[in-house]
Amino acid sequence: MDADAVRERAADLPTEPGVYQFRAGETTLYVGKAVNLRNRVRSYADPRSGRIRGMVGRADRIEFAVTDTETQALLLEANLIKRLRPRYNVRLKDDKSYPLVAITDHPVPRIEVTRDPEEGAVAYGPFTSKGRVETVVKAIRDEYRLRGCSDHKYANRDRPCLDYEMGICSAPCTGEIDPESYAEDVAAARRFFEGETGVLADPLRRRMEAAAENAEFERAANLRDRLEAVEAFHGEGGEAVSDHSDDRTVDVLAAAVEGDTARVARLHSERGQLVDRSRHRLDAAAVGDDGEGDEDGFADPDANTPAAVLSAFLTQYYAEREFPDAILLAERPSDPDVIDWLEAEGVSVRVPGAGREAKLVELALKNARKRGGREDPVGALGERLGIDRPARIEGFDVSHAQGTAVVGSDVCFVDGSAETSDYRRKKLTDRNDDYANMRELVRWRAERAVAGEDDRPDPDLLLIDGGGGQLGAARDALAETGWDVPVVALAKAEELVVTPTGTRRWPDDAPELHLLQRVRDEAHRFAVSYHQTVRDEVKTVLDDVPGVGPQTRRRLLRRFGSVESVRDASLDDLTDVDGVGDATADTLRERL
């Protein structure tokens, strides 16, 4: 459209509030709101921004919708932007929450790391490093032996599971511990997450020193690493700045912009304690090539400022969500209508200058600025591998115990975020052969895809958890079925990327490597979780070894951690375990 066409169209528009769209064919280029539709649209006849001139030039028509109020226009604009995803608007792209530690609301509570706590659970966090949180939770279970099983499994046990044998659960399900003692252990775990580091650090330190005195140096080193993680946990944690006298629900928001990409960090506080944290990536339309903004009140030229990003985020995010009691902002949004709308809904909106609230805003701003300038690891991954941008990645892993309870996982990431609705899992043939297991898993996926029996789109990339052997097995499965999909592997030990043309070591801080690690770790977690479910139905082979009763079995698993480690242990190591003599050690080596 040229300037005359824009003016002619504007003359036909009402002077009421509403929403307008610049369209090219069936594509919506831009959605905007206006207090006065005629005046706002007329202002596009002479935009100063080169980018906006380009948008108007591509448009072939302008459509509009009248609303009763400015607030209705604000909400309609937000919903249209989310649905139509116009190129020239700020668009909310993703929403990823951070992990919490939850102690469930159950007569015999369990402890878990989760992003979605059960109703009534006591949640601590959120935390930025899931790995560090899991290390601490493992230390708590090892020391206080809190259960980690589902309530369904807890209610249906008639004998202790392997967690009890390994010393990480006190088996309250079968009465191996009385309720009062278990409650004391739960209370100790709660005290740790409320800031009392010593309830976990002190016993860990004693165990580490005892292991060193007994010349168990490997065990002492492992305990030292765990102790360091525990002692550092609350150092970064004030991650939850808390005030138990505050009974409001509060959202804290800050935005950071780099180029055409913006990131908004959101902290959510309930009753004075942070209970959720998320970061949201947005596409922000930049100013025109001439570097000048638009003076006609048009929002788009300044969309690469934090204030404009906050305006867009607030309307889109809260249009479909429950309002908090208060919203704290790093700066005021560029659009005053947004503040008016929120305050009309009973939300207190402030930009704090000092005190606890200012600290929360600083924390949000720190998170918003995190990883600035490295916003498309998916694109970087495609460039690194020499393939098209792998928007859809599926990750595969296999989990088993000595060839029993063999299962496989198939997880899916879309644009760098987990697509849990597309996760799949499969029981595999029981055998102690990692390569054959991976070949069977990938062949199952490939055959279903080729036959049109899988309701999911084909992925742009397959990621195998493993090294060259697992990658070769996966490629064999693809060749056998004729399914043409790029595939690579990620080896755990040294984080090497294995491709069909060779092994690569990528920089530790490469965002594309971090993406592969997230997919790999999620495939591993999903496989292990399913394996544990299946494993509960399988007797450990130690049950069939003469001379190994429940007490000895428990000591072996507690000492070595798994049946595989028992099998690999030397005779001297085996006889170091109470209850295992030379004859029993020989029998163990023979049977395993």
From Swiss-Prot:
Subunit annotation: Interacts with UvrB in an incision complex.
UniProt record, GO biological process: nucleotide-excision repair; SOS response
Summary of the function given for this chain in its UniProt record: The UvrABC repair system catalyzes the recognition and processing of DNA lesions. UvrC both incises the 5' and 3' sides of the lesion. The N-terminal half is responsible for the 3' incision and the C-terminal half is responsible for the 5' incision.
Primary site of residence: cytoplasm
Keyword Aminoacyl-tRNA synthetase (UniProt): no
Domain GIY-YIG: start-end pairs: 15-90
Pfam family name, one: UVR
Organism of origin: Halorubrum lacusprofundi (strain ATCC 49239 / DSM 5036 / JCM 8891 / ACAM 34)
UVR domain segment(s): 198-233
Protein name: UvrABC system protein C
UniProt-recorded Gene Ontology molecular function terms: DNA binding; excinuclease ABC activity
Keywords from the named record: Cytoplasm, DNA damage, DNA excision, DNA repair, Excision nuclease, SOS response
Family: Belongs to the UvrC family.
Localization per record: Cytoplasm
Cited InterPro entries: GIY-YIG_endonuc, GIY-YIG_endonuc_sf, GIY-YIG_UvrC_Cho, Hlx-hairpin-Hlx_DNA-bd_motif, RuvA_2-like, UVR_dom, UVR_dom_sf, UvrABC_protein_C
GO CC, alphabetical: cytoplasm; excinuclease repair complex
